[in-house]
Amino acid sequence: MPPQNSSDWLHGFQTGADWFLACGNGLEQATASLCDPHAQSPSTVLLVGTREGEAARQALLPGHSHSRSRGVAQLQADGSTLDDEHPLLVASLDMDNVCTKQKPPPKHNARSRYKVAWLSESSPTAEAGSFVENVVGKLLLPFVDVVCLFLDDFSTREAGIRFLQRCGRHSRLSLGWRPQVILASSSTYRHKGSLGLPMFGSIQRVVLPADGRKTLSFSRFRALKNTILTSVKTVRKRRSASKTLYSAYHLNAFFESALRHVATCASSPFSFILATRECNQIQDRLWLCLRDFLRLCAANHTSQEAALEYMASALMLDSLPPGMHRKYATRAIMFPF
């Protein structure tokens, strides 16, 4: 029997004074649905809202079942992109749902769960809203390419911007890893001064047509989908150039590592580079191997440029997660020092 709510990506809940994070089945199920998850590099858009956010999710995922989430976030793959080199994953955050007190998920709906040590110890009376902002900023933002904020789903449009600002303050993402933002609303939104979103990339605005009985859901959100596709393509090019465009298989494994890290450590952000080393530790004898290699190069009169290019290639390939070597050809990462 398939698990219920298999699209739940992340669960967060409080038991007594303790907070917990649990990994849902959403990302694993989406990865399994792809034709070759080791070779496909998906892009992820995070929809943040309530009514409009849910309507957009249904328009972007036609044919999917849309059961109400029991977790902090849901995630599903766009069925029309399952065979694509870069599938689209659609994640959603229902603000009406995540900020209410949640119960622990059924065992079949969560793969692993971790106590949020730093939150339980430092602020045992933390509110659900503060918990969600921490989790979105520290855990979800590093795994999404685009954040789509539905301003009309908040009490005021400024409240929606403030929510994203608070999430951004917790993220500490590097310049090349910041997701782009799409502000969706029923009318043109003009904010006085800066939006105050330094932890995000470029910001675009989309005006949604009025929701009428004769308006098809897909047609209403067509402009939004086109903007999403353009934005994820821009982010994908940037990450491909920096050799940080990971496969679906590796993103699934990375998320488990990130979940564990965020739950246990508040002082440092999750690092994809360090995560690749968890099961692939650098040997203590590395410097001895390099010394011996350079001696052989000197004995065989190998040019300095050739020796350094070879060493750079070996070190770069070794730093990639297992299985990603075929994604980036050796010559593509060889460079002179």
What positions do the PLM features span?
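Conserved GTPase G-domain substructure that encodes guanine base recognition and part of the catalytic core
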Residues: M1-F337
